[in-house]
Swiss-Prot record:
Protein name, as recorded: GMP reductase
Role played: Catalyzes the irreversible NADPH-dependent deamination of GMP to IMP. It functions in the conversion of nucleobase, nucleoside and nucleotide derivatives of G to A nucleotides, and in maintaining the intracellular balance of A and G nucleotides.
PROSITE patterns referenced in this protein's UniProt entry, alphabetically: IMP_DH_GMP_RED
UniProt organism field: Streptococcus agalactiae serotype Ia (strain ATCC 27591 / A909 / CDC SS700)
Annotated binding of NADP(+), by residue: 205-228
UniProt-listed Pfam families: IMPDH
Reactions mediated catalytically: IMP + NH4(+) + NADP(+) = GMP + NADPH + 2 H(+)
SMART domains named among the record's database cross-references: IMPDH (SM01240)
Originating gene: guaC
One GO BP annotation of this record: purine nucleotide metabolic process
Top-level taxon of origin: Bacteria
Active site positions: 176 (thioimidate intermediate)
Length: 327
């Protein structure tokens, strides 16, 4: 039963080094394959309005990174797919599960996107299973990511319905308050939930939420993730769509959750909040730093590629890796 498994989160885990076999971290390969495509890093900027827009998506695709466009400007999705395909780039969009989304999916037959993410807060539901089956029937070549979920049963059920990958994480994100508003979720034990779910998975798992440092990417891969979706570390850049705000002479960018009243436009079923983040500089600099840090992780793992991270030992240190310091 679940109560017998170890419960921990990112800050509770330290990975144990192996002998380094490369002469420079630049020799470490951080690329990852998802479906028929290979991407430069196993990270995905969260498909949120304050993280990604069409310009950011195009930049990421041009540079060889995976992206998922958010679903909150519904009318723009078909023109976006055409724009990306006209430029020879992959199209990766999000859909919900409302009735009109079925007709939308069917309308994409002539210009199908390479990736569709079914994006709802509680993905272990009949509505998601039915949408997976519909997409697979109408667009059989499209890679379907479904979520979000937090249990092995959910992973198995979505995979059996036809999902090509599942997204694991219920409310661990920095601007998500699901655990506070509902009492449910993987907030505070996201890494243990990832480990639990990945043991049941036969297809790729995307860890979504709770990433606070670049080292958490390596930890996610160690515990079963193929890719890692990240919000707060990608928010607040000069290119980020979030509104620019000046406070006491310092510039900030807005960052809010996908179930917040700021995104929904109403105070109903709110499970997200808004925060201000100091402007961080350019997105490409963060991506470069992430890659370099992940290359260092691979070198500590004693390998040359991401898979080496899956085989390292670890210790559970219960919140002590910061030695009393806060991040």
């Amino acid at each position: 039963m679940f109560n017998d498994i170890p419960v921990f989160d990112y800050e509770d885990i330290q990975l144990i080094p192996n002998k380094c076999i490369i002469s420079s971290r630049s020799q470490a390969d951080t690329s990852v394959k998802l479906g028929n495509y290979t991407f430069k890093l196993p990270v995905i900027p969260a498909n949120m309005q304050t993280i990604i827009d069409e310009e950011v998506a195009e930049t990421l695709a041009c540079e060889g990174y995976f992206y998922i466009m958010h679903r909150f400007n519904e009318e723009a999705r078909r023109p976006f797919i055409k724009r990306m395909h006209d430029k020879g780039l992959i199209a990766s969009i999000s859909v919900g599960v409302k009735d009109y989304e079925y007709d939308f999916v069917t309308s994409l037959k002539e210009d199908a996107p390479e990736f569709i993410t079914i994006d709802i807060a509680h993905g272990h539901s009949n509505s998601v299973i039915e949408m997976i089956q519909h997409i697979k029937q109408e667009l059989p070549e499209t890679f379907v990511i479904a979520g979000n979920v937090g249990t092995p049963e959910a992973v198995r059920e979505l995979e059996n319905a036809g999902a090509d990958a599942t997204k694991v994480g219920i409310g661990p994100g920095k601007v998500c308050i699901t655990k506070v508003k509902t009492g449910f979720g993987t907030g505070g034990w996201q890494l243990a939930a990832l480990r639990w779910c990945s043991k049941a998975a036969r297809k790729p798992i995307i860890a979504d939420g709770g990433i606070r440092t670049h080292g958490d990417i390596a930890k996610s891969i160690r515990f079963g993730a193929s890719m890692v979706m990240i919000g707060s570390l990608f928010a607040g850049h000069l290119e980020s769509p979030g509104k620019l705000v000046e406070v006491d002479g310092q510039q900030f960018k807005e960052y809010y959750g996908s179930a917040s009243e700021y995104q929904k436009g109403e105070h109903k079923n709110v499970e997200g909040k808004k925060i201000l983040l100091p402007v961080k500089g350019r997105l490409e600099d963060t991506l470069t730093e992430m890659q370099q840090d992940l290359q260092s992780s691979i070198s500590y793992a004693g390998g040359k590629e991401l898979d080496s991270l899956r085989h390292v030992d670890y210790v559970i240190v219960k919140n002590s890796i910061w030695n009393g310091d806060s991040i």
